[in-house]
């Protein structure tokens, strides 16, 4: 008899977890497209395996050695960064991070809502991350003065997040529709792990928000259990949830491509959001 997780896996049509055992993280590109930001790129030109093994020893030559080695002007226009610096009185830094951003739907929705925040999508899949970056460039060209604050990069967030962000740098961090890794033997690949929660807390400032959402109940329960056990986070209250514009977006199921798919299929999602509280991660 199939378990509920196996039924869910079949219903969603996800590839079998065994398919991603030996993924060459640089050799997985199926189609190459050089859009150069002239028009909105087409997703079909950026085909990609659905899964990557985050525990594989890939090659990540572009990973900064420390946050101060990361160049924001490699992703955002220098003039826009200078305007933010003038307004804020300090160097502009990324404050929102979408981990496993997929095709960047959330970034596009957040951009006009938070025009003064630098928003970064972080994606492990090479072609998908390239799509997000080119999509951002194309949107800037089609809408002058808009979408200046979003971009995407390729990285393994389970290994390198502190290489990009200083302690307390982020205001918001999103984990939306992460790979479920259904098999018990593969669950250590899930993005929310007890050992990693301290890293996420390190990057979030006190009062910052961590958002999780999934269409797999077992994964939702897993993430909630891990975060409930952490002394560095507390669940958002009902009042806080009702007042949060990001929660409103996520409840409607419209900001991400995966969320739109679930909504079209009349599926359910599990949303759990947490506030970073006082306390020092063990670093």
What spans do the regions from the language model cover?
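S-adenosyl-L-methionine
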Residues: 2-97, 105-114, 136-167
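Conserved S-adenosyl-L-methionine
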Residues: 100
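Conserved SAM/SAH-binding beta-strand->alpha-helix loop
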Residues: 125
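Conserved SAM-binding loop
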Residues: 132
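A short glycine-rich, Lys/Arg-flanked "PGG" loop and its adjoining helix->strand segment in the class I
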Residues: 192-206
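Conserved beta-strand signature within the Rossmann-like core of class I S-adenosyl-L-methionine
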Residues: 206-214
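Class I S-adenosyl-L-methionine
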Residues: 223-283
């Amino acid at each position: 008899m199939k378990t509920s997780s196996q039924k869910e896996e079949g219903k969603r049509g996800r590839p079998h977890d065994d398919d991603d055992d030996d993924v060459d993280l640089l050799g997985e590109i199926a189609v190459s497209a050089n859009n150069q930001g002239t028009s909105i790129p087409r997703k079909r030109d950026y085909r990609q395996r659905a899964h990557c093994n985050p525990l594989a020893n890939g090659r990540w030559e572009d990973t900064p050695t420390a946050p101060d080695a990361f160049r924001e002007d490699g992703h955002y226009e220098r003039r826009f960064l200078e305007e933010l610096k003038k307004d804020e009185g300090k160097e502009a830094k990324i404050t929102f991070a979408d981990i496993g951003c997929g095709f960047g739907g959330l970034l596009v929705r957040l951009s006009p809502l938070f025009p003064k925040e630098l928003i970064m999508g972080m994606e492990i899949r090479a072609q998908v991350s390239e799509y997000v970056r080119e999509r951002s460039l194309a949107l800037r060209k089609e809408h002058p003065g808009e979408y200046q604050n979003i971009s995407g990069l390729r990285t393994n967030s389970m290994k390198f997040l502190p290489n990009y962000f200083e302690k307390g740098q982020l205001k918001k961090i999103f984990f939306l529709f992460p790979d479920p890794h259904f098999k018990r033997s593969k669950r250590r690949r899930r993005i929310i792990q007890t050992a990693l929660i301290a890293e996420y807390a390190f990057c979030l400032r006190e009062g910052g928000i961590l958002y999780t959402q999934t269409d797999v109940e077992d994964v939702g329960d897993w993430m909630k259990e891990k975060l409930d056990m952490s002394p560095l986070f507390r669940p958002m209250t009902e009042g806080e949830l009702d007042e949060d514009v990001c929660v409103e977006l996520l409840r409607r199921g419209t900001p991400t491509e995966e969320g739109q798919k679930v909504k079209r299929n009349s599926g359910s999602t599990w949303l759990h959001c947490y506030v970073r509280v006082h306390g020092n991660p063990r670093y």
